[in-house]
Amino acid sequence: REITVIVNKTPVTLRGKESYTFVDILDFYPFDLTTMRGKRLVTNVNGTHAEFIQPIDEGAVIDIYWEN
């Protein structure tokens, strides 16, 4: 299955799985989690706080960034 989502205003296509969760975007979108670049990591799907295990679907709008 293939879906396209928007990550930080950039279209990203996920391929190779039957279903996807938030954490799967890290396989397709370059975001460094190894170094803290703020006080907290913000993870949203369609404007709502998301956990890494949250399912995502076609057209989801995803924000992931460090907040100070």
Segment roles from a protein language model:
Residues 1-68:
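Ubiquitin-like/PB1-type beta-grasp interaction modules and other compact soluble beta-rich domains
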